[in-house]
C-alpha cells in the first residue's frame, strides 16, 4: 500500500467522520513521520509493513469514535504540542481565550510591579485548577518565556491541581516536555529553574491546597450530567469526571442537571484562596 492508496482507503473507511480528510492526513503523518507537504510529494511511496499495520490499526480505532488525538497521543494547543491520553480531556481551541486573558492581565501585573532597575517587586502566584493535561498553565508559562521575554527567575510560581492522579501525571509529562526543551533557555540551570517554579497537588478542588494565589485559572467541568453521558456514547473515551459539571464533593452525580453544581462549589473556594486584589479567570 502506498501513501495515495492509504489516503483513499482511509477516507472511505472514515466517510462518516466529521473530517475524514484531516483525520487520514494526521494519522498518516503519525505513522510515517512525514509532514503534510511530504505526504503530497511522496504519495507513490510505499508504506513499510509496520507502517501499514499501524495505519490500519489507527483507522480501525478512529472508526470506533476514538479521537485522533488519543490515537496519536498529541494535540496542538496555543501553538504547542501537548501529550494527551484518555485520562485527560483533549484541549479545545476555545480554551485559548483563557490563555489570552491571563497573559493580558499578567502583562499589567508585571508592569505595576516593575522597579526602576527592571527587577520585579512581586512574583505572581498562579493556580491552574482542574488542570487536566496542564495545557492552560503550561501555555501561559511557555508564552511568557518565548513571547514576552520574562526571565526565568521572574516567571510565575505555578500550582497545578487536579482530582485525578493520572491527569497530574500527564501534566508533569507535558511540563517536562515543553518547559524542558530549551527554547529561549540557554543553559541547563535555566531548565531546572523553570521546572522548579511548578508544584503539583492532587486535590478535590481546594481541599488539599493550603496556598493563596494572585491568579486562579480554571476551565472546570460544566456539561450537564445527562449531556455528558450522551456525548460519551460516540466512543470518544474522554473522562466523564472532566466533563460532568453535576458532580458532588465525592465525585458522584449530585442530582442536578444544569452543569453548574461543581462550579457553584468552586467559585467560593476560589475567592477564599485569592489574595486581596487577586484575579479569577474562568
Report residues per predicted region.
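Conserved AdoMet
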Residues: 30-105
